[in-house]
Design a protein with these regions (language model features):
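C-terminus-biased signal that marks the final domain/tail of proteins
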Residues: 1-110, 198-219, 224-230, 234-236, ...
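Intrinsically disordered, low-complexity terminal tails and inter-domain linkers enriched
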Residues: 285-343
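Short, surface-exposed beta-strand-loop junctions and turns on beta-sheet-rich folds
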Residues: 130-132, 177-179, 236-238, 394-397
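Acidic, Ser/Thr-rich peripheral helices and adjacent loops at domain boundaries
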Residues: 240-244
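Residue-level marker of intrinsically disordered, low-complexity segments enriched
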Residues: 9, 141, 151, 296-299, ...
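Internal mixed beta-strand/loop scaffold within catalytic domains of large alpha/beta enzymes
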Residues: 96-190, 375-378, 387-388
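Short, well-ordered beta-strand elements within core beta-sheets of diverse protein domains
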Residues: 193-197
Length: 410
């Protein structure tokens, strides 16, 4: 079950521009390769929906929104372009790939599944599913020089995706789909980057997310040592979704907040997101000691040193009320272990024969845009400011396949 070790970029720089230049220089070849795939993907998806895309114009439109919200992110992308020797609009397009694909009418079969367990030691993780043709277009990273140092995974040329920062603020990432999605606002990947580089607390992270003027939908799950919440973002607004009464957050690729679910696009097109959500909700009940309890769940604490730390209640909540703090654990039923790597892969390793394809495998043949795979499995432990990353789906993970990352000090 050995998986190849991923490149880890150590990004440094005392200004956004310098951090971008450092990223561009280090990832130059990978950015060039990734752009070629995305350029073809944009065109293929648009053609399949009888649409024509002006990708430079769309990318620069998102830049204008970003400059108004967080100009330092634009400066960082400008640095990436310079370091990589690429036109600026191509780097902007990579960071706005979710928004541009929304304009193209992209189907999102596969996508991501996330689990978080709150309690005395809140932990979580996810499958990151994307196009098989981009399986080599991502890397691990540590970033210093911003307000908060952070670590995580991202795609070549994209500033951030999944990660945790030195303040112990982690973010997990699931794309959603809304009828109003477009490429006019701040790209969701840049919103995640802003949280990782600036948020010093759970409340700050949630405040940044709910204040971001996005134009494409996503749910970013904020995880700290003692609390968690999913923040649903859409052109129609935002909503904070609290854990259920057992302390669990189960996320796939549809809205849970009723006000935003009225504009649901993904679930109407592809009901498999509901199948994954239903299966995972059943599995976490088993993990917590329900019918068919998995007694081997204690092995995570022994194997990885993660201590012990529970379907869905949705709706707006204030940042400080989204989950109980360490001294207010009423209503949360602590189970046999934290959600470390071993427990995470047992819960996420599900295929079609199990009732839903949480762990995705690409078909051998097929066109670009239709070959989805789980490219990475990520476990996050905010109390330790750390992640563990497995290159591939949870069904291929083992103790020796995880790469540990710790958020650096700025």
């Amino acid at each position: 079950m050995n998986s190849p070790r991923r490149t880890t970029l150590r990004i440094t720089g005392d200004t956004p521009r310098r951090r971008g230049e450092d990223r561009g220089r280090q990832a130059r070849a990978g950015i060039t390769r990734a752009w070629r795939v995305y350029e073809e993907l944009f065109a293929t998806v648009a053609a399949g929906n009888a649409r024509t895309l002006d990708v430079p114009a769309l990318a620069l439109r998102t830049v204008r929104a970003t400059r108004a919200w967080a100009p330092e992110l634009v400066a960082e992308m400008e640095g990436v372009a310079e370091g990589a020797g690429m036109p600026f609009w191509t780097i902007a397009a990579l960071n706005a790939r979710t928004e541009i694909l929304a304009e193209a009418g992209a189907p999102r079969t596969g996508e991501c599944s996330t689990l978080v367990r709150t309690g005395p030691r809140t932990t979580g993780g996810q499958c990151w599913d994307w196009h098989q043709e981009l399986a080599d277009a991502w890397h691990l990273q540590t970033v210093t020089g911003d307000t908060q140092g952070f670590a995580g995974i991202t795609e070549h040329g994209i500033l951030a995706k999944i990660g945790v920062n030195e303040a112990g603020v982690g973010v997990l990432f699931n794309i959603l789909g809304h009828t109003d999605d477009a490429a006019t606002g701040v790209p969701v990947h840049l919103v995640a980057r802003q949280v990782l580089g600036a948020a010093a607390s759970f409340a700050e992270a949630v405040g940044m997310l709910t204040g971001a003027p996005v134009s494409a939908s996503t749910v970013i799950t904020v995880v700290t040592a003692d609390r968690a919440a999913s923040v649903e973002l859409a052109p129609a607004g935002s909503a904070v979704v609290a854990p259920d009464d057992r302390g669990w957050l189960v996320r796939t690729n549809h809205f849970l907040a009723p006000a935003l679910a009225a504009g649901e696009l993904r679930g109407r097109r592809e009901a498999e997101t509901y199948d994954r959500h239903r299966l995972l909700t059943e599995r976490v009940l088993t993990h917590d000691g329900g019918p068919g309890t998995d007694a081997s769940a204690v092995s995570d604490a022994e194997t990885y040193g993660w201590e012990a730390s529970g379907s869905e209640v949705s709706g707006p909540a204030t940042p400080d009320a989204a989950t109980p703090g360490p001294d207010a654990s009423h209503g949360v039923a602590p189970g046999p272990s934290a959600l470390g790597p071993d427990a995470l892969v047992r819960l996420l390793a599900a295929h079609r024969d199990d009732g839903a394809e949480v762990c995705c495998h690409a078909p051998v043949e097929g066109r670009l845009g239709g070959r989805w795979a789980t490219l990475a499995t990520v476990a996050v432990d905010p109390a330790e400011r750390s992640l563990r990353v497995h290159g591939g789906g949870p069904c291929s993970a083992g103790p020796e396949t995880w790469t540990p990352l710790t958020a650096p000090r700025r």
